[in-house]
Swiss-Prot record:
GO terms for molecular function: magnesium ion binding; orotate phosphoribosyltransferase activity. Belongs to the purine/pyrimidine phosphoribosyltransferase family. PyrE subfamily. Its EC number is 2.4.2.10. It comes from Bacillus licheniformis (strain ATCC 14580 / DSM 13 / JCM 2505 / CCUG 7422 / NBRC 12200 / NCIMB 9375 / NCTC 10341 / NRRL NRS-1264 / Gibson 46). 5-phospho-alpha-D-ribose 1-diphosphate binds at residues 94, 98, 100, 120-128. GO terms for biological process: 'de novo' UMP biosynthetic process; pyrimidine nucleobase biosynthetic process. Homodimer. Gene3D superfamilies: 3.40.50.2020. This is Orotate phosphoribosyltransferase. Keywords: Glycosyltransferase, Magnesium, Pyrimidine biosynthesis, Transferase. Pathway: Pyrimidine metabolism; UMP biosynthesis via de novo pathway; UMP from orotate: step 1/2.
Amino acid sequence: MKTDIANHLLKIKAVFLRPNEPFTWASGILSPIYCDNRLTLSYPEVRDDIASGLAGLIQDKFPGAEMIAGTATAGIPHAALAADRLSLPMCYVRSKPKAHGKGNQIEGAVVKGQKVVVIEDLISTGGSVLEAAAALTEAGCEVLGVAAIFTYGLPKAAAAFSEAGVEYHTLTDYDTLTEAALAGGYITEQDAAKLKEWKADPESKSWMN
């Protein structure tokens, strides 16, 4: 499954690998990879495999789930598709409460004590999805964990999830994608070495040499 999803992301160009022309993240980090999982929605086969994968992941890792929550906005469609396959209720969590109306941060019929799994499309540092999990906890839900399509596998994210005490699982990851890209001829051995070096220390620029 991990390799299949990685190949999907590479084929539809949801993931770009540019070891020699790095992208600049909002945080200022120079990165050899850019991931846009929103593109997966435009490809029915890919979208279906992701929905089935997330549903299976939740059944396997979080069998007690009673509600699926999507992070706004990228996690919403994937949460809806997975919830449909699992025949479970679904809600979504805004990054902050609305400035008008009822001022909701969580949209949907959420019941206190409900066991919830949060779906995110991409995990970089983990900040946004952990904020969503915190909002659900504050609303009285029991957050079982997080399911996502892809993770960069950065140490900072692992530390953040550990500190928050939140379990997380993904359909594929950075290492699997790098291996698939090399096997598929998307990158060279030299590129793969740069990608590995970047992951070890994303804030360093030594991998660019």
